[in-house]
Structure formats: structure tokens, C-alpha cells
């Protein structure tokens, strides 16, 4: 017999002093919650305890799942996109030497992109080496790509570092030389000039390398269900990060019906703790319970270009 879950919490609180120390981890993935994942999990711990399983149903790049594991919480990792769950599992199961193989040149990038049947490693190569992690365009412009790619490769081979690359002799030597000065003098905007010294490929590999920490903690196996596949779950915490209402929803396998999702979430809240991450929800049955003032974005969908803060929503009266 299913019993209705009653959780008496007057308001959602967060004592930031209790947040786990160290960097948040997860795949470099579009829409990742890595910037606020540590806060989200600490909010769950402080307000709803640590004894209930957490279902990360729109898991994406795994930032929430990873944070749950690092906090010793039971978590179920799910995303409808099998490519991303396979990628997460693959990175966690591999070592640093394998991660180094993911960095590729501009030419290789478009060769991989053109492949009809892509492997999980191919998916990761496109993810890591693409602008905005969208797997569409190469990370660097055609004009600068060879120099920056070759520099990144040389730093890996000579110094075996992903982070701290600016302190290496190789980086200092090349960025003060004639080759680097050549493309720094091209007619670029000031903002673009400021970005040129960054080797984003190494920064992406550093993010992947951090996921190695999960190897010693847990064996991760993702599922690839629609959220409807969790309709029988009871007595759990459902963390839901659906496509944003009113956005163009690019990158999602199917068009997403927000109202149908809200109806489902409302029903699930009768027997579970349901937390939705979004910028806004039009359904009046839900209300904001926490706002991340430093986590914002500019939404271009639906003609709304105003900056919005990331928020957590729950059914009114359910907490």
C-alpha cells in the first residue's frame, strides 16, 4: 500500500558553510548544473535528509549524480539520451592516459562528425572539442586552431598537465613568441583578444579527469527512460531538470510538452519529494522555494531576452 509522503519543512534553508569543499564535477555538457550542483545537493541534505534515494531523471552530464555520490547519497542516474549516459559511464571507468586521446585537431573533428556510426569515444571527442559543447563547430577558429591544438598537445606530452598549463615553460615560450603574436594582431574585438590565450581543450580534459574520483566510490550505471518510466517510484526525492519552458529546446531528442510534465510532477509529489530546476514555471500549482542569484542565463526562446536566475520549484504546500 502506498502511503502519502508528508514532509514538514517551513522554508528551504541552506547553510553554505556545510557545502562540500572542492570542485563540482561532471561532463562539459550543454545545460549542465555543475555551477550549482554542490548547493542543490546540500539543500536536499539539509532540508530533506539523507535517507531517501535520489532520482536524477534528466541527468545530462551527471553533475548532480556525481555530487550525490561524493556526498554518500544513493542516486539513480537517468537521461533519455543514451549517448550522454554512455559517455559519463565511459569517462568514469577510464584513466588519465585514455582521457589524453580525446583531444583532436580541427580536421579530425570534422572527420569524426561526418561518421555515420559514431562510438562513445567519438561522441566524447565531439563534445570536448566543440564550441559550447554542442558537437557542431570546432572549439577554435580556422585561423587559430592549428597553433592552439599543437600547443595543447605539446603541453600534455612535455608536462602532463591539464590545469595550470599557463605556468608551463612551453606555454610561456610559445605565447611570447612570433607565432602567437601573429594571430594576436589580427583585427579582433578586445573581448576576443582576452580569450585567445586560453586553451579550452585542456580545460575540458581537466573536467573529465576529475570524474576519475568516482571510480573508487561507486559503479555507475545509467538508465535511458522517459520520465514517465518512473511513475511507480514512491518515498524518494525526484530532482528534475527538464527542458526550459518556452525555450527552443535544441539538443533534445523529442519536443518536450511542459504542461504534460507539470501534471506528472504534481501527481508524483503526492508520494515523493519533487524538486524542479528551472528559470520559471507557468503552472500556478508550483512555487519558487530557492533562487540561485549568481546562476543566471539569457534565454532566447519565446522572444524573452531578459536575464533570469536559476531557481528550484516545488508543489505549493508539499514541503
Language-model segment annotations:
Residues 1-55, 59, 63-64, 70:
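S-adenosyl-L-methionine
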Residues 40, 54-68, 77-82, 124-137, ...:
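Conserved proline-anchored active-site loop of SAM-dependent methyltransferases
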Residues 68-70, 230-234, 280-288:
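Short loop/helix-cap segments at secondary-structure boundaries that form the rim of catalytic
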Amino acid at each position: 500500500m502506498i502511503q502519502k509522503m508528508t514532509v514538514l519543512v517551513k522554508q528551504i534553508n541552506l547553510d553554505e558553510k556545510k557545502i562540500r569543499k572542492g570542485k563540482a564535477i561532471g561532463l562539459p555538457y550543454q545545460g549542465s548544473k555543475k555551477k550549482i550542483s554542490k548547493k542543490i545537493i546540500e539543500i536536499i541534505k539539509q532540508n530533506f535528509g539523507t535517507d531517501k534515494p535520489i532520482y536524477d531523471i534528466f541527468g545530462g552530464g551527471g553533475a548532480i549524480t556525481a555530487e550525490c555520490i561524493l556526498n554518500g547519497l544513493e542516486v539513480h542516474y537517468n537521461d533519455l539520451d543514451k549517448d550522454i549516459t554512455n559517455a559519463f559511464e565511459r569517462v568514469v571507468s577510464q584513466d588519465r592516459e585514455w582521457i589524453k586521446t580525446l583531444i583532436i585537431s580541427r580536421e579530425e573533428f570534422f572527420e569524426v562528425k561526418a561518421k555515420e556510426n559514431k562510438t562513445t569515444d567519438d561522441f566524447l571527442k565531439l563534445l570536448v572539442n566543440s564550441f559550447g559543447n554542442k558537437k557542431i563547430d570546432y572549439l577554435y577558429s580556422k585561423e587559430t586552431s592549428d597553433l592552439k591544438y599543437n600547443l595543447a598537445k605539446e603541453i600534455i606530452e612535455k608536462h602532463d598537465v591539464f590545469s595550470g598549463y599557463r605556468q608551463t615553460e612551453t606555454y610561456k615560450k610559445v605565447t611570447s613568441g612570433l607565432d602567437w603574436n601573429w594571430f594576436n594582431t589580427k583585427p579582433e574585438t578586445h573581448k576576443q583578444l582576452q580569450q585567445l590565450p586560453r586553451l579550452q581543450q585542456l580545460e575540458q580534459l581537466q573536467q573529465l579527469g576529475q570524474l576519475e574520483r568516482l571510480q573508487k566510490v561507486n559503479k555507475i550505471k545509467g538508465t535511458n527512460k522517459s520520465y514517465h518510466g518512473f511513475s511507480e517510484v514512491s518515498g524518494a526525492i525526484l530532482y528534475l531538470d527538464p527542458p526550459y519552458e518556452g525555450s527552443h529546446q535544441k539538443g533534445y531528442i523529442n519536443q518536450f510538452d511542459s504542461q504534460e510534465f507539470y501534471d506528472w510532477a504534481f501527481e508524483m509529489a503526492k508520494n515523493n519529494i519533487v524538486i524542479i530546476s528551472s528559470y520559471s514555471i507557468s503552472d500556478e500549482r508550483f512555487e519558487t522555494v530557492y533562487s540561485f542569484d549568481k546562476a543566471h542565463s539569457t534565454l532566447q526562446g519565446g522572444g524573452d531576452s531578459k536575464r533570469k536566475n536559476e531557481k528550484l520549484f516545488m508543489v505549493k504546500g508539499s514541503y
